[in-house]
Amino acid sequence: MVLDPTQKKSVIDAHAKHEGDTGSPEVQVALLTARIEDLTGHFKEHKKDFHSRTGLLKLVGRRRNILNYLKKTDVQRYRALIEKLGLRK
């Protein structure tokens, strides 16, 4: 599902590196995580919505690719982001 503009702005403000930052890996991963969490709630009610489930898997893959890029380039930022979003154990 799509985030409404107020939710999107709050996620961007929480993870932006500087004013107007919408493209850093941290912001991209945070936005994808918010969309993934929204879709996960959707699937609790609509268990047989397989078409949306394929979209969810694409979002998870995109987030994984961005996280891999961040891990390759800057491990400190990667670990901080994982901790902040609570993505790993």
Curated annotation (Swiss-Prot):
<dbReference type="GO" id="GO:0019843">
    <property type="term" value="F:rRNA binding"/>
</dbReference>
<feature type="region of interest" description="Disordered">
    <location>
        <begin position="1"/>
        <end position="24"/>
    </location>
</feature>
<dbReference type="Pfam" id="PF00312">
    <property type="entry name" value="Ribosomal_S15"/>
</dbReference>
<keyword id="KW-0687">Ribonucleoprotein</keyword>
<dbReference type="GO" id="GO:0022627">
    <property type="term" value="C:cytosolic small ribosomal subunit"/>
</dbReference>
<comment type="subunit">
    <text>Part of the 30S ribosomal subunit. Forms a bridge to the 50S subunit in the 70S ribosome, contacting the 23S rRNA.</text>
</comment>
<comment type="function">
    <text>One of the primary rRNA binding proteins, it binds directly to 16S rRNA where it helps nucleate assembly of the platform of the 30S subunit by binding and bridging several RNA helices of the 16S rRNA.</text>
</comment>
<dbReference type="InterPro" id="IPR005290">
    <property type="entry name" value="Ribosomal_uS15_bac-type"/>
</dbReference>
<dbReference type="InterPro" id="IPR009068">
    <property type="entry name" value="uS15_NS1_RNA-bd_sf"/>
</dbReference>
<dbReference type="InterPro" id="IPR000589">
    <property type="entry name" value="Ribosomal_uS15"/>
</dbReference>
<dbReference type="GO" id="GO:0003735">
    <property type="term" value="F:structural constituent of ribosome"/>
</dbReference>
<comment type="similarity">
    <text>Belongs to the universal ribosomal protein uS15 family.</text>
</comment>
<comment type="function">
    <text>Forms an intersubunit bridge (bridge B4) with the 23S rRNA of the 50S subunit in the ribosome.</text>
</comment>
<keyword id="KW-0699">rRNA-binding</keyword>
<keyword id="KW-0694">RNA-binding</keyword>
<feature type="compositionally biased region" description="Basic and acidic residues">
    <location>
        <begin position="1"/>
        <end position="21"/>
    </location>
</feature>
<protein>
    <recommendedName>
        <fullName>Small ribosomal subunit protein uS15</fullName>
    </recommendedName>
</protein>
<keyword id="KW-0689">Ribosomal protein</keyword>
<dbReference type="GO" id="GO:0006412">
    <property type="term" value="P:translation"/>
</dbReference>
